[in-house]
Amino acid sequence: MASLDESQVRVILLDIEGTTTPIDFVYKTLFPYASRKLESFVREHARDPEIASLIEELRAQHELDERNRLQPPGWLEDSAEVRLRSSIEYGQWLIARDSKCAPLKSLQGKIWQQGFESGELRGQVFPDVPIAFERWRRKEKIICIYSSGSVLAQQMLFRTTPSGDLTSYISQFFDTRVGVKTESESYEKIAASLSRGPREFLFVSDAVKEIEAAQSAGMQAILCSRDPFADASPGAGRIIHSFDEIFGD
């Protein structure tokens, strides 16, 4: 990895899971909540045009999974009820596999939105996150988020934290609609969308493959490990354990 040149950084691009937000919150709160609510949500909103479109996207994804021999549960179209049941069973299968496919993430985002709005869910971030956001804003850094969760889910998470609504600090949200997080082209698209050169970005994530993809696109990157006793992975470059280490006062 090339040495980090903080003087060039104008945009701080952040991962969520394991970086701004505890992994346990994602896997022990958000995912189980979506799984529990999936059937009732789909049945209640199946006739909504947006949800109907997501169900159709799931059907197309199902065909792709079959072609790739991933052995998803069967999808039948014998009747509206059978189609609905197929979409629910397939959705549960995708959740169990921690799939990052866009229609599932959008559907999860809709379910989580209801949970956040009802107060059943509240966003979680590490304690250093709101402090860092305020510090970076003082230093005139642009803060953006890139997560596999839908943009809607990202916004709801940061809007409902114990520290209050943090979305005013965030200029842009990106999800897998821009591309897979382990592919360099995704980071190139993000840079182009903000009309910035890649070296103006500092990407922070807990995933080595994502770090490598960002670096391949020309971005600067830091591996974030919230475990203070973890060793840096080979080739990961610089590693931090807290946002206090990024543009600290």
Task: List each model region and its residues.
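Asp-based, Mg2+/Mn2+-dependent phosphohydrolase catalytic module
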Residues: 1-8, 168-249
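Asp-based phosphoryl-transfer active-site loop
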Residues: 5-26
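Short, well-ordered beta-to-alpha junction loops that form the rim of enzyme active sites
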Residues: 16, 146-150, 206
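Short catalytic/ligand-binding loop motif for oxyanion handling, primarily in non-cytosolic enzymes
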Residues: 20-24, 152-155, 212, 230-232
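Metal-dependent phosphoesterase signature
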Residues: 65-127
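Substrate-recognition element of Asp-dependent hydrolases with the DxDx(T/V) motif
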Residues: 109-110, 118-161
